[in-house]
């Protein structure tokens, strides 16, 4: 449907019988109204043409071939001069055959039938509104018992029954005998209500606002009593309060959506368009039919039988009528949801019939597979792998995927730069993978974001925008910090990539959907781009060092390990080692590591800036080394101070490792980049 803002939307809910009739009925040019399916037949076994008023009737659902009626006559579609617009012999309109994808029909039920979703699904909406046990309502729906209508003011049979003792044997046996008499239909229609009709009458008598007020009053009364000390009673009260809350919310929803409660009981059963439940001819002349067709046939057979019992056979026993109503109810239940809270119906090969619920629900259902998960142009799919060298807002796109997604843009670039005379020549260059193709592809990708999506998309961070870069291989590279937003793991998960085409979509991707703009959880506001798993392990290894400290003693087990340029004797715990190297800056330290002169966790002394003090006023030096020129070294736990003869601080060295230096430089560059970006701001 399309709302007033011209937004296409799909809304699921209950509708009135009048609305179903409006959807299905259509008036032919001769004034005849068609739409009701009355016969359980599909195709004639000799002519292979749809049966009239059957499940594939061309009068109801439209012609199988565009502009050709059931008689074989042909008319040009849309030609205003050709009259009439339908065949006078078979009554089929000369319209496009695509009408069979959306034209509905309906079955007029001989008795009301409850919708199984509202009755047997938990929580049961019908049971909540009527405030009655589900088991009692099921017994009423399936004609296991009845209730009396309080409509007659004069003494009636049921009113007189209260003046007798039901325990008397003669009275107990007289009631069943009366139910089998010929006058039972009149008595039943006047005073007894059973089946789904009884549910419909009770739902029609409900006042939703009174339900809300009474439930609220009862909820407040239960809350005023407080705990009784009896655990069983307190649980019972708690369950009752929860039920009242659900009942009020349900009533408010019915009021807000303008849905009447009695619409949960069906009088007209919609029939799906035939193209959504096709019959296909396979090899050998055999026909393959959708299971829904067989379930519809079952409903029509039983409904027609009930209609005959109510109209033609006046002497039909009441018990037989009630039994047939139960069969109609069960047939509709099987059509809507086969096997809900019971044994499913099976065919001759012991295969469970696929009902309407099975068609639309689940991963392979109509919504998730066809509507939500349908394949679209300018999209691809591949496995994701970690790309630690990528920026947070970038993703690595394989060349094979990128050239397919941006092929039209590359073709336009080749033609504009006069590198190809037409589309065919441009495609030929792309197939041959000429170097100029990759240059143009990179130019195109620089100004065009892509969208990455991981199913299931449970919140808005399931789709984020990235700036693509070309990578080798066939996997999509992703920054590890965005993993949590997608709820993805790098263990074989797949993600889909989409190219936004319109300017509005590209602007939305850049302003709202880029990954570096979605650092907080939209639900609770906590940071969502945080290091996890292997990133934490990597940071630990990077900054762990050898953890020996400057004070080497024989009780530290780390001192027993062998290091380069170091020997430890276990006999007398004496050790000799080369002096730890001194570096003037971090570049020299990292250069020494790359030349394999030191290890990642080897301790070293790094000159520190004097303006960044690391001195603790209360800390005393562990050792003091004096030199011949008067300068001396004060050695502390994790730093070293070089002082002049006048006790002025000349240099400060900190004891660190290459791993610490690398992490510090990354953090420093990130902070400087952030400050630089902020300086250009308003």
Curated annotation (Swiss-Prot):
The lineage of its organism: Eukaryota, Viridiplantae, Streptophyta, Embryophyta, Tracheophyta. One of its GO terms (cellular component) is DNA-directed RNA polymerase complex. Zn(2+) binds at residues 69, 71, 87, 90. In plastids the minimal PEP RNA polymerase catalytic core is composed of four subunits: alpha, beta, beta', and beta''. When a (nuclear-encoded) sigma factor is associated with the core the holoenzyme is formed, which can initiate transcription. GO terms for molecular function: DNA binding; DNA-directed RNA polymerase activity; magnesium ion binding; zinc ion binding. It is found in: Plastid, Chloroplast. One of its GO terms (biological process) is DNA-templated transcription. Its cofactor is Mg(2+); Zn(2+). Its EC number is 2.7.7.6. Keywords: Chloroplast, DNA-directed RNA polymerase, Magnesium, Metal-binding, Nucleotidyltransferase, Plastid, Transcription, Transferase, Zinc. Its main location: plastid. The keyword Ribosomal protein does not apply. Belongs to the RNA polymerase beta' chain family. RpoC1 subfamily. It comes from Panax ginseng. It catalyses: RNA(n) + a ribonucleoside 5'-triphosphate = RNA(n+1) + diphosphate. Mg(2+) binds at residues 489, 491, 493. DNA-dependent RNA polymerase catalyzes the transcription of DNA into RNA using the four ribonucleoside triphosphates as substrates. Binds 1 Mg(2+) ion per subunit. This is DNA-directed RNA polymerase subunit beta'.
């Amino acid at each position: 449907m399309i709302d007033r803002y011209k937004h296409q939307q799909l809304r699921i809910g209950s509708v009135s019988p009048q609305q179903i009739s409006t959807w299905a009925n259509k008036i032919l040019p001769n004034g005849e109204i068609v739409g009701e399916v009355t016969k359980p037949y599909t195709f004639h076994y000799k002519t292979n043409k749809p049966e009239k008023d059957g499940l594939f009737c061309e009068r109801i659902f439209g012609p199988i071939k565009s502009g050709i009626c059931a008689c074989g006559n042909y008319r040009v579609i849309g030609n205003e001069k050709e009259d009439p617009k339908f065949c006078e012999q078979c009554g089929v309109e000369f319209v496009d055959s695509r009408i069979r994808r959306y034209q509905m029909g309906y079955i007029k039920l001989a008795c009301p039938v409850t919708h199984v979703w509202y009755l047997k699904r938990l929580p049961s909406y019908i049971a909540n509104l009527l405030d009655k046990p589900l088991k009692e309502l099921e017994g009423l729906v399936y004609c296991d018992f009845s209730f009396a209508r309080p409509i007659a003011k004069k003494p009636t049979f049921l009113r007189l029954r209260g003046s007798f003792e039901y325990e008397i044997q003669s009275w107990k046996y007289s009631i069943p005998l009366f139910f089998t008499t010929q006058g039972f239909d009149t008595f039943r229609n006047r005073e007894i209500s059973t089946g789904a009709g009884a549910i419909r009458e009770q739902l029609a008598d409900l006042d939703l606002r009174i339900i809300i007020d009474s439930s609220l009053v009862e909820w407040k009364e239960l809350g005023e009593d407080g705990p009784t000390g009896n655990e069983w009673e307190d649980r019972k009260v708690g369950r009752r309060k929860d039920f009242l809350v659900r009942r009020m919310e349900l009533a408010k929803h019915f009021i807000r959506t303008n849905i009447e409660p009695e619409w949960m009981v069906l009088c007209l059963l919609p029939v799906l368009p035939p193209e959504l439940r096709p019959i296909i001819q396979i090899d050998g002349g055999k026909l393959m039919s959708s299971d829904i067709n067989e379930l519809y046939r079952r409903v029509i057979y039983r409904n027609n039988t009930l209609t005959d019992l109510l109209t033609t056979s006046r002497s039909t026993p009441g018990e037989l009528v009630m039994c047939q109503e139960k069969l109609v109810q069960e047939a509709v239940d099987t059509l809507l949801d086969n096997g809900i809270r019971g044994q499913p119906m099976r065919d001759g090969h012991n295969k469970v019939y696929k009902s309407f619920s099975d068609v639309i629900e689940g991963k392979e259902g109509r919504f998730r597979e066809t509507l939500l998960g349908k394949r679209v142009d300018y999209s691809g799919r591949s496995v994701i792998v970690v790309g630690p060298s990528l920026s947070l807002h970038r993703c690595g796109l394989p060349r094979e995927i990128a050239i397919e997604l941006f092929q039209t843009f590359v073709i336009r670039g080749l033609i504009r730069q006069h590198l190809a005379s037409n589309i065919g020549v441009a495609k030929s260059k792309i197939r041959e993978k000429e170097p100029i193709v990759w240059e143009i592809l990179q130019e195109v990708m620089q100004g065009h974001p892509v969208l990455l999506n991981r199913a299931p998309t449970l919140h808005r961070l399931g789709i984020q925008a990235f700036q693509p870069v070309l990578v080798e291989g066939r996997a999509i590279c992703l920054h590890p910090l965005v993993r949590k937003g997608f709820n993805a793991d790098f263990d074989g998960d797949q993600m889909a990539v989409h190219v936004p085409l319109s300017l509005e979509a590209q602007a939305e991707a850049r302003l709202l959907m880029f990954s570096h703009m979605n650092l907080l959880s939209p639900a609770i506001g906590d940071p969502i781009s945080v290091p996890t798993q292997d990133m934490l392990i990597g940071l630990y290894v990077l900054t762990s060092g050898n953890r020996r400290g400057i004070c080497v003693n024989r009780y530290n087990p780390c001192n027993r390990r062998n290091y380069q340029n170091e020997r430890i004797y276990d006999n007398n715990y004496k050790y000799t080692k080369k002096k730890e190297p001194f570096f003037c800056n971090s570049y020299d330290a990292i250069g020494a590591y790359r030349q394999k002169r030191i290890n990642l966790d080897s301790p070293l002394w790094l000159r520190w800036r004097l303006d960044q003090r690391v001195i603790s006023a209360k800390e005393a030096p562990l050792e003091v080394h004096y030199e011949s020129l008067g300068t001396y070294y004060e050695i502390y736990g994790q730093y070293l101070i070089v002082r002049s003869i006048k006790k002025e601080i000349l240099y400060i060295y900190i004891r660190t490792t290459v791993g610490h230096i690398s992490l510090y430089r990354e953090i420093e560059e990130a902070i400087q980049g952030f400050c630089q970006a902020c300086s250009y701001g308003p």
